[in-house]
Amino acid sequence: MFRKYFLFTTCFYLSLFSVAQIDETKVETVQKFDEVLTYINRLYVDSVDDKKLTDAAIVALLEKLDPHSTYISKEEVDEANSSIMGSFVGIGVRFQILKDTLMVVATIPGGPSEKIGILPGDKIVRIENENVAGVGLKNNQVREKLMGELGTKVKIEILRKKAKKPLNFVITRDHIPINSVDSYYMITPEIGYIKLNSFSRTSQDEVQKGINFLKDKGMKHLIFDLQGNGGGLLDAAQRLADEFLSGEKLIVYSEGRAQPRNNLNAGKKGLWESGSLILLTDEYAASASEILSGAIQDWDRGMIVGRRTYGKGLVQRPIDLTDGSQIRLTTARYYTPSGRFIQKPYDNLEAYEDDLNIRFKNGEFSHADSIKLPDSLKYQTNITKRTVYGGGGIMPDIFVPIDTSASTDYFSDLIQGGHLTSFSLEYVDKNRDAIFAKYATFDEFKKNFTIDKKFMDEFLAYVEKEDKELKFNEEQFKTSEGLLKLRMKAVLAQDLWGYSEFYQIYNDSNEILQRAIEVIQKGEYEKTNLDRKN
C-alpha cells in the first residue's frame, strides 16, 4: 500500500517540475521528500495511513503558496464541480428534516419528482425499502440515498395528507439544475431586478431568461445583485459581461510567471448594452463577481452600489492527478480593463483569513472614509476618466453602510438555530390549503398577509418548547420584531412558492438595494450620463 502512494507522491512532484527542465536542486528536493516518507513508513512508532499522510503533505505544500491553491480529494471532486457545472444527478426535490422526518419542501420544476407527481408537504418515510423516518439521518446521508448515477431508479414511499395509505413511487434519476439566478422580478413598473448567487455553466442562459422577461414587462433600469456571490467560472463572468458591454471591449486580463498575458473581450450583441445598470456588491462578493463589477465600472457602463468587494483575483487552474484527485493551482492574477489588480494582499495569511473581521473593526463597513488608499492605487475609468481604486477588491461608486440597528443576538440565534425554517415548514404543512384558499396568488399574499400577534405568540411558544437553552429576550425581541416579521413572511413565501418570492419580500430590508432604487428614482443615475457614454 505504501509503495503505491510513494510512487504517486513522487509522480505528483515530478509532474509539477516537468513544465520546465528539472535542475539538480529540484531533484534533490523530490528525493528529500521521498526519503522522509520512507523513514516514516519504516521507523515511526505507530502505523500510518499512507493516503492520509500524502494528502496532508499536499495540503500543507499548497497552503504555503497562497490562500487559494487547494487540494481536492478524489471523493470530493464531483461535489466540488457540481455547483459550477450547474447541475447534479438526483430526483429533483428540495427537502428538510423536520422532527426526524424527511419532508419535501419543493420539487424542482421540470425534474423527475415533479413529473411523477411528488408534492410539497409529502413525507418520505422509506427509500429502497429502508426506513428513513425517526432514525436520525443527517442531510448528507439523505442526499447519498437520493443521488446516484444518471438513469438509475430509486424507490420511495411517502405519506401524504388526505391519502388513506402510503404512496409508492419509482423515480428515474436525472440531471437536476442548480440555479445560479435566485430571483428576477419587477420592483417598480420600470425597475427590474436580478439576483445572481454564483457563476456557473448555466448562468448566461438564466440571466438571459431574466432579462427577456423583465424587458417584456417594460424594464428601463436593471439592478443586478451580486451581494454574497463568491464567484465561480471565469467564462461565465465573461459571457455575462458581454451581455452588458458593446463592441469588443476588454473585460479582464490575466498574467502570471508561467502564463503570458491573456485578454478576454466582449464580442457579441448583448441583451442589455444600453439602459441603466446598477450592480450591488458587498464584502462577500468575490472573484467572478469582481471581474464583472470591475469591467462595468472601468468602461463606465453602470454604477456599483454597496460596499468594497472581497478581493480575490487569483487564477486557479484545475489539474487532475493520476488517482482522480485534483489540485487547483494559482497560475496568474486577474486585472480589470484599467489595469487594477483585484487580489488583496496575502503576505500575512493569518490576517488574510481574518480580513473581514479586521475591516469591520476598523469601521470600513460603517464609514466610507475609513478606507485610506494611497495615490499609487488610483486609476481612471476608460471613458469618463473617473477615479477608481486598486489594491484589492472593487470599491463602489456609492457606499452603503451596513445597518445593524435591527439585528440582535436573539434574532441571530433564531435564524442560526433554524427555528424560523422549521416553524414555517410545520405551519405551511398544517395550513397549506387554507393559505391558498385565502391567497390565490403570491401577489395577494405579499399585499395582504400579515404576521399578527397570534402568529408570533405561536412561534415564540414553539421556540420555547424546542430550544430550552435559548432564553426569550424581550428587549432584543422588540428591537428585532419588525425584521423578524419580515423574515418570517419571506420564509413562508419561500416554502409556498419558491426562492424568488422570498427575495421579493425580504428585499424590503436590503439597504443596498433600497439605496440603488433611490439612485434611480431621485435622478442620481441620470446625472452621471453613463447611459450616453457607451
Q: Residue ranges of each PLM-predicted region?
A:
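Generic structural signal for buried aliphatic residues
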Residues: 124-125, 154, 342, 388
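Extended, small/polar residue-biased N-terminal targeting/export presequences
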Residues: 34, 44-105, 151-183, 506-517, ...
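A sequence-level detector of short linear motifs
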Residues: 133, 168, 328, 343, ...
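Cleft-lining beta-strand/loop regions that shape enzyme active-site pockets
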Residues: 20-29, 33, 37-50, 73, ...
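Polar, glycine-rich mid-to-C-terminal structural blocks
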Residues: 288, 300, 307, 311-379
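Bacterial Sec-dependent N-terminal signal peptides
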Residues: 1-26
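Conserved functional hotspot residues or short segments at active or partner-binding sites
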Residues: 341-342, 346-534
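Residue-level recognition of conserved beta-strand edge/terminus positions
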Residues: 127-128, 159, 330, 345, ...
